[in-house]
Amino acid sequence: MFYAESVPRNSPLVIGHRGAPGYRPEHSRSSYELALAMGVDAVEPDVVATKDGVLIVRHENEISGTTDVADHPEFADRKTTKRVDGDALTGWFTEDFTWAELSTLRIRERLPEVRASSASFDGAQQILRLRDVLDIVREGSTEHGREIGVVLEVKHATYFASLGLDLAPLIDQELREAGWAAGELPLVIESFESTVLGQLRERGISASYIYLIEASGRPYDLLVAEGKRALTYKETVAPKGLDALVGRFDGISVSKKMLLDRGNTIVADAHARGLQVFTWTCRPENAFLAAEFRGAGGRGEFGDYEAEWSVIARQGIDGVFVDHPDLGVAFFRG
Protein backbone atom coordinates (compact mmCIF):
# COMPACT_ATOMS: atom_id res chain seq x y z
CA MET A 1 0.00 0.00 0.00
CA PHE A 2 1.03 3.59 -0.54
CA TYR A 3 1.46 5.78 2.50
CA ALA A 4 -1.44 8.13 1.78
CA GLU A 5 -3.16 6.94 4.94
CA SER A 6 -0.50 8.73 7.01
CA VAL A 7 -0.95 12.06 5.21
CA PRO A 8 -3.56 14.49 6.55
CA ARG A 9 -6.50 15.18 4.23
CA ASN A 10 -5.41 18.81 3.87
CA SER A 11 -1.98 17.69 2.64
CA PRO A 12 -2.39 15.41 -0.36
CA LEU A 13 0.41 13.46 -1.93
CA VAL A 14 2.13 15.61 -4.54
CA ILE A 15 2.94 13.49 -7.58
CA GLY A 16 5.30 14.61 -10.34
CA HIS A 17 3.24 13.93 -13.46
CA ARG A 18 5.74 12.47 -15.97
CA GLY A 19 8.42 14.00 -13.73
CA ALA A 20 8.59 17.78 -13.91
CA PRO A 21 7.36 18.46 -17.47
CA GLY A 22 6.69 22.11 -16.77
CA TYR A 23 10.47 22.52 -16.85
CA ARG A 24 11.94 19.58 -18.77
CA PRO A 25 10.65 17.32 -21.58
CA GLU A 26 8.25 14.77 -20.12
CA HIS A 27 9.53 11.34 -19.08
CA SER A 28 13.17 12.40 -19.46
CA ARG A 29 15.83 11.62 -16.88
CA SER A 30 16.22 15.31 -16.07
CA SER A 31 12.45 15.64 -15.66
CA TYR A 32 12.35 12.88 -13.05
CA GLU A 33 15.48 14.01 -11.24
CA LEU A 34 14.19 17.58 -11.02
CA ALA A 35 10.86 16.39 -9.61
CA LEU A 36 12.64 14.44 -6.88
CA ALA A 37 14.81 17.45 -6.02
CA MET A 38 11.70 19.65 -5.79
CA GLY A 39 10.22 17.47 -3.07
CA VAL A 40 7.52 15.31 -4.65
CA ASP A 41 6.11 12.33 -2.79
CA ALA A 42 6.12 10.26 -5.99
CA VAL A 43 6.59 10.43 -9.74
CA GLU A 44 4.36 8.99 -12.45
CA PRO A 45 5.77 7.00 -15.38
CA ASP A 46 3.37 5.94 -18.14
CA VAL A 47 4.25 2.46 -19.40
CA VAL A 48 4.01 1.07 -22.94
CA ALA A 49 5.82 -1.82 -24.65
CA THR A 50 8.28 -2.26 -27.49
CA LYS A 51 8.19 -4.93 -30.19
CA ASP A 52 10.52 -7.10 -28.13
CA GLY A 53 8.58 -6.69 -24.89
CA VAL A 54 10.69 -4.02 -23.19
CA LEU A 55 8.66 -1.64 -21.01
CA ILE A 56 9.41 2.01 -21.73
CA VAL A 57 7.98 5.26 -20.40
CA ARG A 58 5.95 7.25 -22.91
CA HIS A 59 2.55 8.86 -22.46
CA GLU A 60 1.26 6.97 -25.48
CA ASN A 61 2.58 4.40 -27.92
CA GLU A 62 2.60 6.93 -30.81
CA ILE A 63 5.88 8.79 -30.38
CA SER A 64 6.16 11.43 -33.11
CA GLY A 65 5.07 14.23 -30.77
CA THR A 66 7.69 13.58 -28.09
CA THR A 67 10.74 12.23 -29.95
CA ASP A 68 12.78 12.97 -33.06
CA VAL A 69 11.67 9.77 -34.81
CA ALA A 70 10.47 11.72 -37.87
CA ASP A 71 14.04 12.94 -38.40
CA HIS A 72 15.41 9.40 -38.72
CA PRO A 73 15.34 8.35 -42.41
CA GLU A 74 16.02 4.75 -41.43
CA PHE A 75 12.60 4.67 -39.76
CA ALA A 76 10.61 6.51 -42.44
CA ASP A 77 8.89 3.32 -43.57
CA ARG A 78 7.58 2.65 -40.06
CA LYS A 79 5.12 5.54 -40.27
CA THR A 80 1.62 4.13 -40.41
CA THR A 81 -1.99 4.58 -39.35
CA LYS A 82 -3.49 2.43 -36.61
CA ARG A 83 -6.60 2.34 -34.49
CA VAL A 84 -5.64 2.56 -30.81
CA ASP A 85 -8.40 2.30 -28.21
CA GLY A 86 -10.88 3.04 -30.98
CA ASP A 87 -9.13 6.16 -32.31
CA ALA A 88 -7.33 6.38 -35.66
CA LEU A 89 -3.76 7.65 -35.20
CA THR A 90 -1.01 8.24 -37.74
CA GLY A 91 2.65 8.18 -36.79
CA TRP A 92 5.29 5.89 -35.37
CA PHE A 93 4.38 3.33 -32.69
CA THR A 94 6.52 1.76 -29.99
CA GLU A 95 5.32 -1.77 -30.76
CA ASP A 96 6.90 -1.52 -34.22
CA PHE A 97 10.40 -0.91 -32.81
CA THR A 98 12.83 -2.91 -30.75
CA TRP A 99 14.29 -1.32 -27.65
CA ALA A 100 17.66 -1.09 -29.39
CA GLU A 101 16.06 0.97 -32.16
CA LEU A 102 14.14 3.24 -29.80
CA SER A 103 17.27 3.88 -27.77
CA THR A 104 18.69 5.79 -30.76
CA LEU A 105 15.91 8.40 -30.55
CA ARG A 106 16.01 11.61 -28.54
CA ILE A 107 13.23 13.21 -26.52
CA ARG A 108 11.42 16.44 -27.42
CA GLU A 109 9.04 18.78 -25.64
CA ARG A 110 5.42 17.96 -26.47
CA LEU A 111 4.17 21.57 -26.29
CA PRO A 112 6.99 23.92 -27.37
CA GLU A 113 4.58 26.78 -27.98
CA VAL A 114 3.48 26.62 -24.33
CA ARG A 115 6.72 25.47 -22.70
CA ALA A 116 9.52 27.06 -24.70
CA SER A 117 12.03 26.79 -21.86
CA SER A 118 11.49 23.04 -21.66
CA ALA A 119 11.91 22.79 -25.43
CA SER A 120 15.43 24.20 -25.04
CA PHE A 121 16.38 20.74 -23.73
CA ASP A 122 15.19 18.96 -26.89
CA GLY A 123 17.49 16.37 -28.39
CA ALA A 124 19.66 15.85 -25.33
CA GLN A 125 18.17 12.76 -23.70
CA GLN A 126 17.22 9.19 -24.54
CA ILE A 127 13.92 7.44 -23.94
CA LEU A 128 13.87 5.70 -20.55
CA ARG A 129 12.79 2.19 -19.71
CA LEU A 130 10.56 1.54 -16.72
CA ARG A 131 13.56 -0.04 -15.01
CA ASP A 132 15.50 3.21 -15.44
CA VAL A 133 12.78 5.19 -13.67
CA LEU A 134 12.52 2.66 -10.84
CA ASP A 135 16.27 2.94 -10.32
CA ILE A 136 16.21 6.75 -10.48
CA VAL A 137 13.56 6.87 -7.77
CA ARG A 138 15.33 4.35 -5.55
CA GLU A 139 18.58 6.29 -5.84
CA GLY A 140 16.72 9.57 -5.29
CA SER A 141 15.14 8.25 -2.11
CA THR A 142 18.61 7.57 -0.75
CA GLU A 143 20.04 10.86 -1.97
CA HIS A 144 17.22 13.00 -0.59
CA GLY A 145 16.77 11.02 2.63
CA ARG A 146 13.07 10.26 2.28
CA GLU A 147 10.82 7.59 0.84
CA ILE A 148 9.74 8.53 -2.68
CA GLY A 149 7.17 6.47 -4.51
CA VAL A 150 6.21 5.54 -8.04
CA VAL A 151 2.71 5.85 -9.50
CA LEU A 152 2.90 3.48 -12.46
CA GLU A 153 0.28 4.04 -15.14
CA VAL A 154 -0.46 1.11 -17.44
CA LYS A 155 -1.33 2.39 -20.93
CA HIS A 156 -3.40 0.72 -23.67
CA ALA A 157 -3.42 -2.72 -22.02
CA THR A 158 -6.26 -4.16 -24.12
CA TYR A 159 -4.68 -2.86 -27.31
CA PHE A 160 -1.26 -4.32 -26.50
CA ALA A 161 -2.81 -7.66 -25.52
CA SER A 162 -4.41 -7.83 -28.98
CA LEU A 163 -0.88 -7.68 -30.43
CA GLY A 164 0.40 -10.46 -28.19
CA LEU A 165 2.08 -8.05 -25.77
CA ASP A 166 0.40 -8.80 -22.44
CA LEU A 167 1.45 -5.99 -20.13
CA ALA A 168 0.52 -7.59 -16.79
CA PRO A 169 3.19 -10.33 -16.80
CA LEU A 170 5.77 -7.93 -18.25
CA ILE A 171 5.13 -5.41 -15.47
CA ASP A 172 5.06 -8.13 -12.83
CA GLN A 173 8.44 -9.44 -13.92
CA GLU A 174 9.97 -5.96 -14.13
CA LEU A 175 8.80 -4.94 -10.66
CA ARG A 176 10.04 -8.17 -9.09
CA GLU A 177 13.44 -8.00 -10.78
CA ALA A 178 13.83 -4.34 -9.77
CA GLY A 179 12.87 -4.98 -6.14
CA TRP A 180 9.62 -3.02 -6.28
CA ALA A 181 6.98 -5.76 -5.94
CA ALA A 182 7.00 -6.46 -2.20
CA GLY A 183 6.52 -3.02 -0.68
CA GLU A 184 10.19 -2.05 -0.66
CA LEU A 185 9.20 1.50 -1.63
CA PRO A 186 5.75 3.08 -2.02
CA LEU A 187 4.03 1.94 -5.21
CA VAL A 188 0.72 2.79 -6.85
CA ILE A 189 -0.49 1.08 -10.01
CA GLU A 190 -3.14 2.91 -11.99
CA SER A 191 -4.95 2.53 -15.29
CA PHE A 192 -8.04 3.63 -17.16
CA GLU A 193 -8.68 -0.09 -17.68
CA SER A 194 -9.86 -2.04 -14.64
CA THR A 195 -9.09 -5.41 -16.21
CA VAL A 196 -5.32 -5.01 -16.13
CA LEU A 197 -5.47 -3.63 -12.58
CA GLY A 198 -7.25 -6.79 -11.50
CA GLN A 199 -4.69 -8.94 -13.29
CA LEU A 200 -1.79 -7.22 -11.55
CA ARG A 201 -3.44 -7.39 -8.14
CA GLU A 202 -4.01 -11.12 -8.60
CA ARG A 203 -0.28 -11.50 -9.18
CA GLY A 204 0.38 -10.36 -5.62
CA ILE A 205 2.22 -7.12 -6.27
CA SER A 206 2.18 -5.01 -3.09
CA ALA A 207 0.75 -1.69 -4.22
CA SER A 208 -2.25 0.58 -4.03
CA TYR A 209 -4.50 0.08 -7.05
CA ILE A 210 -6.12 3.22 -8.40
CA TYR A 211 -8.76 3.33 -11.14
CA LEU A 212 -8.32 6.28 -13.49
CA ILE A 213 -11.48 8.13 -14.47
CA GLU A 214 -11.98 10.35 -17.52
CA ALA A 215 -14.52 13.16 -17.50
CA SER A 216 -16.45 11.45 -20.31
CA GLY A 217 -16.63 8.23 -22.29
CA ARG A 218 -16.27 4.57 -21.33
CA PRO A 219 -13.22 2.45 -20.43
CA TYR A 220 -11.88 0.78 -23.55
CA ASP A 221 -11.49 -2.67 -22.00
CA LEU A 222 -15.12 -2.72 -20.87
CA LEU A 223 -16.31 -1.26 -24.17
CA VAL A 224 -14.63 -4.15 -26.00
CA ALA A 225 -16.10 -6.71 -23.60
CA GLU A 226 -19.58 -5.26 -23.04
CA GLY A 227 -20.25 -2.70 -25.74
CA LYS A 228 -22.71 0.05 -24.85
CA ARG A 229 -23.70 -1.89 -21.72
CA ALA A 230 -20.38 -0.87 -20.16
CA LEU A 231 -20.61 1.75 -17.44
CA THR A 232 -19.51 5.23 -18.42
CA TYR A 233 -16.84 6.91 -16.35
CA LYS A 234 -19.46 9.29 -14.97
CA GLU A 235 -21.61 6.36 -13.88
CA THR A 236 -18.56 4.84 -12.20
CA VAL A 237 -18.18 7.79 -9.81
CA ALA A 238 -21.89 7.83 -8.93
CA PRO A 239 -22.70 6.14 -5.60
CA LYS A 240 -23.74 2.83 -7.16
CA GLY A 241 -20.64 2.77 -9.34
CA LEU A 242 -18.37 3.50 -6.38
CA ASP A 243 -20.03 0.69 -4.42
CA ALA A 244 -18.87 -1.72 -7.12
CA LEU A 245 -15.23 -0.61 -6.71
CA VAL A 246 -15.03 -1.33 -2.97
CA GLY A 247 -12.82 -4.33 -2.32
CA ARG A 248 -11.45 -4.29 -5.87
CA PHE A 249 -9.44 -1.07 -5.82
CA ASP A 250 -7.99 1.28 -3.23
CA GLY A 251 -9.19 4.44 -4.88
CA ILE A 252 -9.92 6.45 -7.98
CA SER A 253 -8.05 9.18 -9.83
CA VAL A 254 -10.41 11.58 -11.55
CA SER A 255 -9.99 14.30 -14.12
CA LYS A 256 -9.84 17.67 -12.38
CA LYS A 257 -12.72 18.74 -14.63
CA MET A 258 -15.00 16.55 -12.53
CA LEU A 259 -13.89 18.23 -9.31
CA LEU A 260 -14.30 21.71 -10.82
CA ASP A 261 -17.94 20.88 -11.47
CA ARG A 262 -19.51 22.89 -8.65
CA GLY A 263 -21.62 20.85 -6.30
CA ASN A 264 -20.00 17.51 -7.11
CA THR A 265 -19.70 15.06 -4.20
CA ILE A 266 -17.16 12.67 -5.69
CA VAL A 267 -14.52 12.98 -2.96
CA ALA A 268 -17.02 12.77 -0.11
CA ASP A 269 -18.81 9.81 -1.70
CA ALA A 270 -15.55 7.94 -2.30
CA HIS A 271 -14.21 8.63 1.19
CA ALA A 272 -17.47 7.38 2.69
CA ARG A 273 -16.67 4.04 1.03
CA GLY A 274 -13.04 3.96 2.10
CA LEU A 275 -11.70 4.89 -1.33
CA GLN A 276 -8.90 7.39 -1.86
CA VAL A 277 -9.24 10.13 -4.48
CA PHE A 278 -6.42 11.47 -6.62
CA THR A 279 -6.85 14.07 -9.37
CA TRP A 280 -5.02 15.07 -12.54
CA THR A 281 -3.53 17.35 -13.67
CA CYS A 282 -2.94 20.67 -11.88
CA ARG A 283 -1.05 22.99 -14.21
CA PRO A 284 -0.58 26.77 -13.89
CA GLU A 285 -0.61 27.83 -17.55
CA ASN A 286 -3.63 29.47 -19.15
CA ALA A 287 -3.70 26.66 -21.72
CA PHE A 288 -4.79 24.21 -19.02
CA LEU A 289 -6.85 26.30 -16.60
CA ALA A 290 -10.62 26.44 -16.57
CA ALA A 291 -11.80 29.59 -18.38
CA GLU A 292 -12.70 31.48 -15.21
CA PHE A 293 -9.14 31.17 -13.88
CA ARG A 294 -7.22 32.22 -17.00
CA GLY A 295 -5.22 35.42 -16.88
CA ALA A 296 -3.88 37.93 -19.38
CA GLY A 297 -1.31 36.88 -21.92
CA GLY A 298 -0.82 33.82 -24.03
CA ARG A 299 -1.41 30.13 -23.48
CA GLY A 300 1.98 29.69 -21.82
CA GLU A 301 1.46 32.44 -19.26
CA PHE A 302 0.40 31.55 -15.73
CA GLY A 303 -3.17 32.34 -14.80
CA ASP A 304 -4.82 32.34 -11.38
CA TYR A 305 -3.88 28.73 -10.82
CA GLU A 306 -3.99 29.03 -7.04
CA ALA A 307 -7.69 29.90 -7.19
CA GLU A 308 -8.38 26.84 -9.34
CA TRP A 309 -6.28 24.58 -7.16
CA SER A 310 -8.05 25.88 -4.06
CA VAL A 311 -11.38 24.62 -5.39
CA ILE A 312 -9.82 21.18 -5.71
CA ALA A 313 -7.89 21.19 -2.43
CA ARG A 314 -10.94 22.14 -0.37
CA GLN A 315 -12.61 18.89 -1.36
CA GLY A 316 -10.04 16.86 0.60
CA ILE A 317 -8.24 14.99 -2.16
CA ASP A 318 -5.61 12.40 -1.22
CA GLY A 319 -3.22 12.92 -4.12
CA VAL A 320 -2.64 15.42 -6.91
CA PHE A 321 -0.65 15.20 -10.14
CA VAL A 322 1.33 18.32 -11.03
CA ASP A 323 3.60 19.37 -13.90
CA HIS A 324 5.48 21.99 -11.84
CA PRO A 325 6.47 20.13 -8.65
CA ASP A 326 7.85 23.19 -6.86
CA LEU A 327 4.53 25.01 -7.26
CA GLY A 328 2.57 21.91 -6.29
CA VAL A 329 4.61 21.29 -3.15
CA ALA A 330 4.39 24.96 -2.11
CA PHE A 331 0.64 25.15 -2.65
CA PHE A 332 -0.69 21.81 -1.49
CA ARG A 333 1.63 21.50 1.51
CA GLY A 334 1.58 25.20 2.35
Locate predicted features:
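Phosphate-group recognition and catalysis centered on beta-loop-alpha active-site segments
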Residues: 1-334
